[in-house]
Each structure stands twice: as structure tokens, then as C-alpha cells.
From Swiss-Prot:
Gene name, Swiss-Prot/TrEMBL: sucC
One GO term of the biological process aspect: succinyl-CoA metabolic process
Protein name: Succinate--CoA ligase [ADP-forming] subunit beta
PANTHER family: SUCCINATE--COA LIGASE [GDP-FORMING] SUBUNIT BETA, MITOCHONDRIAL, SUCCINYL-COA SYNTHETASE BETA CHAIN
The keyword Metal-binding belongs to this UniProt entry's keyword annotation: yes
Gene Ontology MF annotations: ATP binding; magnesium ion binding; succinate-CoA ligase (ADP-forming) activity; succinate-CoA ligase (GDP-forming) activity
Cofactor list: Mg(2+)
Length: 386
């Protein structure tokens, strides 16, 4: 689960991280009132969407008067903000953060993720904070320092100070920077986050260290422990199809292709998408029905896939382990009739009750294309859309 920047800063503040004064706004009038309450002479008007690259996309602007704040707020609020993370369709801006300006002497980056290779939390920091951090990661990875944290000890004073010195924080401010790193680590750990990031973390002219941005992702499997985090959820920022899918315990992510995929198991789903691409097609979605799929779940999965008007064919790829192929076959038949399926459907089933499932499909009277291998299934579904 993702949250907005202003919510991330509220969270950081609870853990003692230094953040600028700021007020969220949902209208132009609220933005102006926020600027007046904060006082000048400079304000930052920031679009609030669940995507990075807002500055480059025109979603972060400086206002040097109340009138300019009003003008910028009216331009940004309601705009379709396009960044490298939103895709070409962009994301509508429904909220703003009005923030006091900062005296920026130097920008740094600090982020925390779980490293699966070492099975430890990785704290990353760089002297090259700001809008181009992704280019730094791609082209100058040596500029990103990493510390792999012992979970029993946490991020120690020595590790935090070494990281601060390593990215060039002036010695007089190393203690402050190290403390901010440790507070960010505690926020990450205590909230079951999967990502915690400050970009930029700035050094001011007076030597203070301030978090000018905040980005958090949370492990959805741990949200039952954090109702205060769940309260931050903004459904307007989520794909309606993904929200609908979650109601039926379906893992669904919409993509840009035209071949719908219905698969059981995340690994098989990814392999199926790879195979489609290998044979010249483009998957329209990731959809994992899981090991306990019912006819109802399969029907809902078809409905969700077909709401995407880009879908020109569907591939069902099932391995019957816990899931029985006859149950999937029943669901496919029910779904085809319920949605009046009018796009080509290719079905591959292997495993438990495979022959029974194939027999049910063959006797259904529906124009279902069968396949025995993944390569055959991918070949047939790609041919169906050409």
C-alpha cells in the first residue's frame, strides 16, 4: 500500500524526523488559506499523487506571493499529471501539499528497503539527491552507499555516522544526519514498511538536516497490525479494477497489452506473460486466481479482465495442484456464458483432474481453443489477436 507525501511526513514527524511545516489542501481556497497560515515569503505547491517524478512532470512549483500560490494551485489541482511512473495516461491531481520554502545548501538521498539476497534491511544513501536519483542509480551506482543492517542491533550510531560521512555531509552536521537516518529506520521497521525514502534530504545554510520529501510503501500482509496506516489509504489513487479484484481475493495488475491472462500462481503467471512476449504478444494484465479459486472467482476474473477494452483475446493457463482443473473448467464455462464472451479464448490445463476438465470444455459447445503446452498456448493466443 502506498500513501501520499504529506501523510508520509506526518508519519516521519511521529518518529522525530525533521520535516518542513506544511498543510494539505483539497481546493484552491484551502491552498491559499494554508499559505497564509504558514507565512512567506516562499511556498512550495506540490501535487499529491502516488507516483514519483512530480517535479519533472510540472507538479511541484515555487510560489513567491499569495496570488502566485493561488494561480499555481488552480493550475496543478485537477491536472492530469504525467510522470515516468504514471504511464502516458497520467494521474489526476486531487490533493496538494502547501509547504514552507527551504534554504537548500545541498541535496542528499536516503532510502530503506529489504534486500532479499542478504535477508537484511538495506539502508541506501547518496550525495546525489534530487530529481535525477534514478539516473544516478542507473549510470553511477558507485555513488549510492549501502549498509546492510543486523536486525538484532538495528542501524547503529557508527553505521549511521559512517553513512553520513560517506555521502559528504559536513562534519558539523554528521550527528544530525545520522540521527535522521536512525529515525527513518525506526519508522520503516515499526510500521512494517517495504520502502521508506527521503529524496531529497537537505542540508540547510544553517547546518540543519530536513526531509523535503517522504515516500512509503507498506507490506499489505502486515496492515492488520496497523489500522492507523490503513486510514491513510486513498482509493482514488488505485486502479478501480485492482480494487474490485481484491474483493474476490484476486491478484490483478493491469498492463498495456491486449492479451488477457488468467493463471493460478504468481510464478506461473509471470512465466505465462514472458512466454506471450516471447511469441510476439503483449499481456494485458497479471491475474493470479490463487490455489482456492471457485467458479464465482473465475467468473469475476473474466469480468474484470474484459472491463479493459484493450483485451482482444484471453489465455487461461492452469496447473492443477491444489486447484482442480475441473473446477477451473466449470468456472470458465460459467464465465463465458455470464459475460457473453466475444473474444478468442485459449485454455491450457495440466494436473489434477486434467482430463475431466478438458472433457467439460470440449462438451460445453463454446468456441474454446485448447492447448497442451505453454508454447502452443502462447502461439495460438498471439495468432488470435493478429
Amino acid at each position: 500500500m502506498k500513501i501520499h507525501e504529506y501523510q508520509g511526513k506526518e508519519l516521519l514527524k511521529q518518529f522525530g524526523v525533521t520535516v518542513p511545516r506544511g498543510i494539505p489542501a483539497f481546493s484552491v481556497d484551502e491552498a491559499v488559506a494554508a499559505a497564509e497560515k504558514l507565512g512567506g515569503p516562499v511556498w512550495v505547491v506540490k501535487a499529491q499523487i502516488h507516483a514519483g517524478g512530480r517535479g519533472k512532470g510540472g507538479g511541484v512549483k515555487l510560489g513567491r506571493s499569495i496570488d502566485e500560490v493561488r494561480q499555481l494551485s488552480s493550475e496543478i489541482l485537477g491536472m492530469q499529471l504525467v510522470t515516468h511512473q504514471t504511464g502516458p495516461q497520467g494521474q489526476k491531481v486531487r490533493r496538494l501539499l502547501i509547504e514552507e520554502g527551504a534554504d537548500i545548501k545541498k541535496e542528499y538521498y536516503v532510502g530503506i528497503v529489504t534486500d532479499r539476497g542478504t535477508q537484511r534491511v538495506c539502508v541506501m544513501a547518496s550525495s546525489e539527491g534530487g530529481m535525477d536519483i534514478e539516473e544516478v542509480a542507473a549510470h553511477s551506482p558507485e555513488k549510492i552507499l549501502k549498509v546492510f543492517v543486523d536486525p538484532a542491533a538495528g542501524l547503529t550510531d557508527a553505521e549511521a555516522a559512517e553513512l553520513a560521512r560517506g555521502i559528504g555531509v559536513p562534519e558539523a552536521s554528521v550527528g544530525k544526519a545520522a540521527a535522521e537516518f536512525q529515525k527513518l529506520y525506526k519508522a520503516y521497521w515499526d510500521t512494517d514498511a517495504s520502502l521508506a525514502e527521503i529524496n531529497p534530504l537537505i542540508l540547510t545554510g544553517s547546518g540543519d538536516i530536513i526531509a523535503l520529501d517522504a515516500k512509503f510503501n507498506f507490506d499489505s500482509n502486515a496492515l492488520f497490525r496497523h489500522p492507523e496506516i490503513v486510514a491513510y489509504r486513498d482509493l482514488d489513487e488505485e486502479d478501480p479494477a485492482e480494487i474490485e479484484a481484491s474483493k474476490f481475493d484476486l491478484a490483478y495488475i493491469q498492463l498495456d497489452g491486449n492479451i488477457g491472462c488468467l493463471v493460478n500462481g504468481a510464478g506461473l503467471a509471470m512465466a505465462t506473460m514472458d512466454t506471450i512476449k516471447l511469441f510476439g504478444g503483449e499481456p494485458a494484465n497479471f491475474l493470479d486466481v490463487g490455489g482456492g479459486a471457485t467458479a464465482e472467482k473465475v467468473t469475476e476474473a473474466f469480468k474484470i479482465m474484459l472491463k479493459n477494452k484493450s483485451v482482444k483475446a484471453i489465455l487461461v493457463n492452469i496447473f492443477g495442484g491444489i486447484m482442480r482443473c475441473d473446477v477451473i473448467a466449470e468456472g470458465v464455462i460459467t464465465a463465458c456464458k455470464a459475460v457473453n464472451l466475444n473474444v478468442p479464448l485459449v485454455v491450457r490445463m495440466k494436473g489434477t483432474n486434467e482430463e475431466l476438465g478438458k472433457k467439460m470444455l470440449a462438451e460445453s459447445g463454446l468456441p474454446i481453443i485448447s492447448a497442451d503446452t505453454m508454447a502452443e498456448a502462447a502461439t495460438k493466443v498471439v495468432a488470435a489477436v493478429k
